[in-house]
Design a protein with these regions (language model features):
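Active-site microenvironments of hydrolase-like enzyme catalytic domains
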Residues: 291-389, 421-444
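A short beta-strand element within beta-rich, extracytoplasmic domains
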Residues: 180-204
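Extracellular carbohydrate recognition and processing domains
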Residues: 217-246
Length: 753
C-alpha cells in the first residue's frame, strides 16, 4: 500500500513556491489531515469542531535549575506569598489548561514534566524485567536503530538514554488473529495516578496506527499511535489510576494489529513523572522532575545535545529558556508546518504558548494584570511554510483581550491588562510556528495573586486561553468552531424501580459563549474497587442503570458537543442491598474551592496557610512554604525583607484539595450496615426542591470543608437558606439527619443562623 503524505499536498512543495507564499497571514492550504500523533479511540464522544488533529506545544514557566556561577540548584524566580513563579504557573497549566485543550481533541506536548507522581517505573526491552513478548504469525526482532536503555542511578550532563539501548520491531498484521504483542507489566510501589509514556522508533515503513492498550484498575483504554512521527522520545498517552503491586490488570500492551501494512516498533514504557536524575555540579536537584526546568526533562526525553544545551553546558538558565522552543522545533521539523527542517521528528506542532507570571507592584491596591509578548522583528523573517511572524502578534493580542473580557464577565473585577509587547524574547523568537508568552498576572502584587490563587480564577483564566486558541486555530485554517460546554449541575441519583436507579442532571449555560451548549453527555461508571470506565455517550440529561446487589456504583458525568467535553461533575454513588426496604440519601454539599486565608489590613498583606491552607481543585504542588513577612511597607523589595517572603518547607509536597469524590467514601462506609439502599445528590438539587427528602430513612449531609471564608470569588456556605429550609421541613416530619463537616458550627454565627 502506498504510504500517504503526512500533510495535505505540501511536503513536496518546491522552495520557489514556498518563498512565493512568504508573509501569508493564515496557513492557507497547509493543514495536517492524517492520523494524529496519539488518539484515544475509547473516547465515547466525537469531536468535529474542536481542536481535533491539532498538535500544540504549551508550557509553564521556569523551574528549578543549576546555577553554575553560584554553585547550586535554585529557583529562577523569588519566593513570594507562599509560592514562586516556577511553581505557580504549573497550577494553571497542568490541572486546567492542558486538560481543556485535550478535552477539545488537541494533542499537547509540554517540555516540562507534567506528572506530579514522584514514583517512576520504567519497563524496557533491554532489561526484560516485567517485559514479555509474544510472537505469533509475525516475529519480533531487534531494530537497526538505537533505543532507550536505563542504568542504575543518576545521569551525567549530556548523557542520552535514547542512544544507550535497542528497540524491537514486528511486521503489522491486518487480521485480528494470531496477533503478536508485548506486555509491559510494572510493579507499582503504591496505588495512585501515573502518567503513561511510550517510546518506539520511527522507520521508513512505520504504521500510522499502532495499537496500545492501557489496563488500569480493571478497565482498559485503547490508543492508536502514529509511529511515522515522534520516534526516539517519550510519547504521552494519558494519566491513569493504578493499583499497588504487579498485575496484568495494571499494564500496557502493544500489538501488531493494524489496518495498515508496515512495521510496528516498541521500546521502553514509563509510568510516573519520577524524581530529577540529571547531575549538575556533582549533584541532582533532589526534587520531583515536575519541579525542574525543561532542560533536564529534554535530556531525559532523548533530545539532541544542541537542543538540551545551546550553551554547551555553561549556562543552564539560558538553556532552560531556549530548549522549550528548540525541542518544539525538533519535534515539528519535517512536518507540513516546518517542511524545510528535515532533521526533525515530523510531529505537526503548529502553535506554542508559554504561560508566565510577572513582577511589579501597585501601591494603590489595584491590579498589575495580564501582558502579552510576541516577537515579529527578530529571528527568521518568516515562520515555517512562509507564514508571517505578525500572526504571533495577532495571537498575543487576542489572548490578552479575551482574558480581560472573560475575567470581567465572570467576576466583575475590572481586570487590568498591559497591552502586548513586541520584543526579542527567546520563547517567541525561536519557535518556527506562531507563538506567544502570556504573563498571567504579577506574583509580586498581592491584589493580583490574591485572585490568582483562587481556583475559580484559574479555571476561568485557563478557559479563556483555551477558547482563544480554539478560535485562533479555526481562523488560521478557515474552519468553524464550537466551544466545549461547562460541567453539568444539579446532579442527582434516585431509585425508579426495585433494582434500577436514574442519574439526572442539568446542563450549565455559558452566557458568554453561544456555541458552548451541550448536545450529549458522557456517563462514567466505576463498580466497587474498579476504576472508572471510558464512558457512555447519551443524548438526554438522564441515564437509567440496573444495579447488582452489594456493590457500590460510582458515577460522574460530563457535557459534550462538537467542540469537545467539559470537566466532570462530582462523583455520586448508589448501592442496592438485597432485601433492603429503606434508602439513605447522601447529599454532597462540599463544593468549596478557595485560596488560603487572606491577611489584608492597612499594614499587612499575604496568605496565612496556618489559618486555612485553602482548597485547590484536586491535589496541587504549587506551594513553596509559609509566608514569613507580612509587612506591607516592604512592598516591592527583594530578599528576606520583602513583603511576601517565606519558607520552602512545602516544596515538592503535593497538597490535597477538593477531589469532589467523597460521597463514595460515605457510601462504602454505609454499605457495611447491610440493610439500606443508598443514593446521592448534589446539595443544589435539594435546595431547588428537585429531591423529595421525605422518601429517605436518613439524610447524610456531607459538608467537608465547606464554609463562607469571606474572600473567595464564589460564595460558599455550610447551610444556605434554601438548604436549611428543606432540611427543617424534613426534620419536622421526623426525618433523621447525619451531618459531618469541619465548620458546621463556626460557619453559622449569624443572628438568624
Amino acid at each position: 500500500m502506498k504510504i500517504r503524505l503526512l500533510c495535505t499536498a505540501l511536503l513536496a512543495m518546491s522552495f520557489a513556491n514556498t518563498f512565493a507564499q512568504s508573509g501569508k497571514s493564515t496557513w492557507g492550504k497547509t493543514d495536517y489531515e492524517d492520523a494524529p500523533w496519539v488518539k484515544n479511540v475509547s473516547r465515547p464522544n466525537e469531536i468535529t469542531e474542536g481542536l481535533q488533529n491539532r498538535h500544540l506545544s504549551v508550557w509553564s514557566s521556569h523551574g528549578r535549575y543549576y546555577d553554575a556561577k553560584k554553585g547550586g540548584w535554585r529557583w529562577q524566580r523569588p519566593i513570594l506569598f507562599g509560592t514562586t513563579e516556577d511553581l505557580y504557573t504549573q497550577t494553571i497549566v497542568l490541572p486546567y489548561l492542558i486538560p481543556m485543550l485535550e478535552n477539545a481533541g488537541a494533542i499537547v506536548f509540554t517540555p516540562r514534566e507534567r506528572d506530579w507522581q514522584k514514583n517512576e517505573i520504567i519497563v524496557d526491552n533491554d532489561s526484560r524485567t516485567n517485559y514479555k513478548e509474544e510472537s505469533m504469525k509475525k516475529k519480533w526482532a531487534t531494530t537497526s536503530d538505537k533505543g532507550f536503555a536505563q542504568h542504575y542511578g543518576s545521569y551525567n550532563d549530556g548523557e542520552n538514554p535514547f542512544t544507550a539501548g535497542t528497540a524491537r520491531q514486528v511486521k503489522a498484521r491486518k487480521r485480528n488473529s494470531k496477533i503478536s504483542s508485548v506486555v509491559y507489566q510494572p510493579t507499582f510501589p503504591e496505588t495512585g495516578r501515573y502518567a503513561v509514556y511510550v517510546s518506539y522508533q520511527t522507520q521508513k515503513k512505520s504504521v500510522e496506527a499502532a495499537e496500545y492498550i492501557v489496563f488500569h484498575k480493571g478497565q482498559e483504554t485503547h490508543f492508536r499511535v502514529n509511529q511515522r512521527m515522534g520516534g526516539g522520545t517519550w510519547v504521552y498517552l494519558g494519566t491513569f489510576e493504578f493499583d499497588k503491586g504487579n498485575s496484568i490488570n495494571n499494564s500496557v500492551v502493544l500489538t501488531n494489529h493494524s489496518s495498515h501494512r508496515g512495521i510496528v516498533t516498541t521500546d521502553a514504557v514509563r509510568f510516573g513523572g519520577g524524581m530529577g536524575n540529571i547531575v549538575r555540579g556533582g549533584t541532582v536537584s533532589g526534587l520531583p522532575r515536575f519541579l525542574e526546568g525543561a532542560r533536564y526533562s529534554a535530556q531525559w526525553a532523548g533530545a539532541p545535545w544542541n537542543v538540551v544545551s545551546k550553551s554547551n553546558g555553561s549556562n543552564d538558565y539560558n538553556d532552560d529558556i531556549n530548549c522549550r522552543s528548540l525541542m518544539t522545533n525538533w519535534l515539528a521539523g519535517g512536518s507540513c508546518y516546518l517542511p524545510e527542517k528535515k532533521d526533525g521528528k515530523k510531529v505537526p506542532i503548529e502553535l506554542t504558548l508559554a504561560i508566565h507570571s510577572d513582577a511589579g507592584v501597585k501601591t494603590d491596591d489595584s491590579y498589575v494584570g495580564t501582558l502579552g509578548i510576541c516577537t515579529t522583528q527578530d529571528g527568521n523573517k518568516t515562520l515555517g511554510d512562509g507564514l508571517s511572524r505578525k500572526v504571533s502578534k495577532t495571537f498575543a493580542e487576542q489572548l490578552v483581550a479575551n482574558v480581560k473580557k472573560d475575567l470581567d464577565n465572570a467576576f466583575h473585577i475590572n481586570w487590568a491588562t498591559r497591552s502586548v509587547w513586541d520584543r526579542n524574547y527567546s520563547e517567541t523568537r525561536l519557535p518556527e510556528v506562531p507563538s506567544a508568552i502570556l504573563e498571567t498576572l504579577s506574583h509580586q502584587n498581592f491584589p493580583d495573586i490574591k485572585l490568582g490563587q483562587d481556583p475559580n480564577f484559574k479555571f476561568t483564566f485557563a478557559r479563556s486561553v483555551y477558547k482563544t486558541i480554539l478560535k485562533y486555530e479555526a481562523n488560521m485554517h478557515g474552519k468553524t468552531y464550537t466551544v466545549q460546554p461547562l460541567a453539568p449541575n444539579n446532579f442527582k441519583i434516585e431509585y425508579v424501580s426495585a433494582n434500577k436507579v436514574r442519574l439526572q442532571w442539568r446542563p450549565t449555560t455559558d452566557a458568554s459563549e453561544p456555541t458552548a451548549t451541550p448536545t450529549s453527555y458522557n456517563v462514567y461508571v466505576a463498580m466497587g474497587t474498579r476504576g472508572f470506565d471510558n464512558g457512555m455517550n447519551v443524548r438526554n440529561p438522564y441515564f437509567d442503570i440496573e444495579l447488582l446487589p452489594g456493590v457500590v456504583y460510582n458515577f460522574k458525568v460530563t457535557a459534550c458537543n462538537r467542540g469537545g467535553e467539559s470537566f466532570p461533575t462530582e462523583v455520586l454513588s448508589a448501592l442496592r442491598n438485597e432485601g433492603a426496604t429503606q434508602t439513605i440519601l447522601i447529599v454532597n454539599a462540599f463544593s468549596r474551592l478557595s485560596s488560603p486565608a487572606v491577611v489584608n489590613t492597612s499594614t499587612e498583606q499575604g496568605f496565612d496557610l496556618e489559618a486555612d491552607p485553602g482548597l485547590s481543585y484536586g491535589p496541587v504542588a504549587g506551594w513553596a512554604g509559609r509566608q514569613a513577612n507580612f509587612n506591607k511597607a516592604m512592598m516591592g523589595k527583594e530578599g528576606p525583607s520583602a513583603l511576601g517572603y517565606g519558607g520552602e518547607e512545602l516544596v515538592g509536597k503535593v497538597i490535597a484539595g477538593n477531589d469532589f469524590n467523597y460521597v463514595k467514601d460515605h457510601a462504602e462506609a454505609l454499605r457495611h450496615a447491610g440493610k439500606y439502599n443508598i443514593v446521592s445528590c448534589n446539595s443544589k438539587a435539594v435546595e431547588y426542591g428537585e429531591v423529595n427528602l421525605s422518601k429517605y430513612a436518613m439524610v447524610d449531609l456531607l459538608l467537608g470543608n465547606e464554609k463562607d471564608d469571606g474572600h473567595s470569588l464564589y460564595y460558599y456556605k455550610t447551610f444556605k437558606p434554601a438548604l436549611r429550609q428543606q432540611l427543617t421541613k424534613y426534620l419536622n416530619n421526623r426525618g433523621k439527619l447525619f451531618v459531618s463537616g469541619s465548620y458546621l458550627a463556626s460557619d453559622m454565627q449569624g443572628v438568624d443562623e
